Amino acid sequence: GINKDAIITVEPNKKYMVQGIKFETIPAYNINKTFHPKENDWVGYVIELNDIRYYIAGDTDITEENKRVKCDVAFVPVGGTYTMDFKEAAQLINEMQPKVAVPIHYGSIVGTKQDAEEFIKLLNQNIKGTILMR
């Protein structure tokens, strides 16, 4: 487990190292919705493990900050309503150009497995789409 003395409060646009794990925070917010305002300072994460960079977007739309993320694997919401939808998520991924993209945030509150499947179809051919939630 993680030593509770290592638990920290994070802020957007910062780099951290906790118990040897490097990560940075990327602002996560809505552009044209009120659910996740930028002022709340909520974040997604880029975590580096074994020289592989993983981006976990969190609840967000396409933003100037996440368009600049450099990563190998990206986990992005596709459910719409509270976050970007599958078309917007594919647009973001095609701009970011990770090696692998994984759709998240669908199938329970909003979004469907079909959203995840449609997301995969919209990815550039050089990006591998992977559905983890069946």
Where do the PLM segments sit?
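Residues at alpha-helix termini
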Residues: 1-2, 19, 96
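Helix-loop-beta element that forms the nucleotide-linked donor phosphate-binding surface
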Residues: 1-9
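Short, glycine/charged-enriched secondary-structure capping and boundary segments
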Residues: 2, 38-40, 69-72, 88-92, ...
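A structural micro-motif
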Residues: 5, 21, 52, 71, ...
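Core dinuclear metal-dependent hydrolase active-site scaffold
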Residues: 9-70, 84, 134
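Short, Lys/Arg-enriched charge-dense amphipathic segments
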Residues: 31-37, 81, 103, 128-129
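Metallo-beta-lactamase
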Residues: 46-111
